[in-house]
């Protein structure tokens, strides 16, 4: 199982930890999407920036 993560809000006014987590997930701008594996580490990063992204489950890796 994999997760499609899309950034829906910008990073102006957010904390450094949140910006760093977005970069670690591979997100650089609004409406940019990446597919990441469904692991506890990725879920933890998503939890930190949950107000800035949307997450969808997709089949495959």
Swiss-Prot record:
Any one Gene Ontology BP term: translation
Annotated keywords: Ribonucleoprotein, Ribosomal protein
SUPFAM superfamilies: Ribosomal protein L30p/L7e (SSF55129)
Region annotation Disordered: where it falls in the sequence: 1-20
CDD domains to which the protein is assigned, alphabetical: Ribosomal_L30
Pfam families: Ribosomal_L30 (PF00327)
Annotated InterPro entries: Ribo_uL30_ferredoxin-like_sf, Ribosomal_uL30_bac-type, Ribosomal_uL30_ferredoxin-like
GO molecular function, one term: structural constituent of ribosome
GO cellular component: cytosolic large ribosomal subunit
Family: Belongs to the universal ribosomal protein uL30 family.
HAMAP family in the cross-refs: Ribosomal_uL30_B
Subunit organization: Part of the 50S ribosomal subunit.
Protein name: Large ribosomal subunit protein uL30
Organism: Corynebacterium kroppenstedtii (strain DSM 44385 / JCM 11950 / CIP 105744 / CCUG 35717)
């Amino acid at each position: 199982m994999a997760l499609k993560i899309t950034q829906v809000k910008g990073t102006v006014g957010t904390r450094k930890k949140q910006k760093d987590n977005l970069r670690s997930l591979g997100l650089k701008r609004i409406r940019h999407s990446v597919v990441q594996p469904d692991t506890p580490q990725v879920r933890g990063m998503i939890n930190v920036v949950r107000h800035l992204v949307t997450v969808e489950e997709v089949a495959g890796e």
